Amino acid sequence: QGAPLCERLDWDSRFFGVSIARAVPSRVDLLTRDAILDWCRAQGIDCLYFLADEDADTMRVLEDAAFSRVDDRVTLELQPIPPASSPHADTRAACQSDIAALRKIAAVSHHDSRFYNDRHFDRGRCDELYRVWIDRSCQGWADHVVVVERDGNAVGYLTVHLREPHAASIGLVGVDRTYRRQGIGAHLMDGALAWISGQSVRRVWTATQRRNVASQGFFQKAGFRPTGRAIWYHRWFSPSTGAAS
């Protein structure tokens, strides 16, 4: 028995109400692809996620078997971490009382993600996914959540996860639409990097959508540089199950 080709995603399956798994390899040949498909059918999988390297042979093999390309992913990295500066007065760590406001922002801030780009997923559930995501992040799933406060309310967030060894990743970034273009993103980033600089972290990475030029520009302005590209595919086995209503 070699390494498993797929892993079932219990949380995703419960949330969306369909059986979801993720492929482990990032490159496949014809035989490996067919073994993955056989496993999914035997396990009753409805949807398979596949994060593929930007490899022509892998892409062709997947697309020949009805894998749908739902996102082109860009990875960006910051290394070394710049010296910490004092956080802005409006920037602080998230607290319980911020969650309601952050959930509202999250529901409308991530429409470029692969879930919205797959019509099998109901858009209302996608909105709820990001509400839950920021909620869980504030409850400890993320190692740190930075917020900017204006007029007594949190109007933006940025989540940070510590990775081993000596690395961190930035997850979600969102700003209330009525407060955009006011420098809030820069304050969030400064607050995040100030916290990260005290955590023995040597590099920070993030991933965003290739079509999301604004997001890439935000990170590049902070000193991040592109380091890799990959492609998210979804393969549905039961098109009518979990389809958006």
Regions found by a protein language model. Give the residues of each.
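Conserved N-terminal entry element of GNAT/NAT acetyltransferase domains
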Residues: Q1-R8, R14-F16, L78-S97, P239-S245
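Conserved acetyl-CoA-binding loop-helix of GNAT-fold acetyltransferases
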Residues: V28-D38, L172-V175, R181-A194, G198, ...
